[in-house]
């Protein structure tokens, strides 16, 4: 298990885990999101190749349309 800090909340996930797998497990696949890992924005093209480790800090922002 790995522990991640996601939007200020500690959560545990099975290891190994990539950013793309995390997005799937959080049911965010297909949504317009931006993710920051340890202070760095991760481009969508790198989600599948970005491994996560215990202690990583993630900020996930979901874009909401409106007008």
Task: Show which residues each predicted segment covers.
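Ubiquitin-like/PB1-type beta-grasp interaction modules and other compact soluble beta-rich domains
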Residues: 1-66
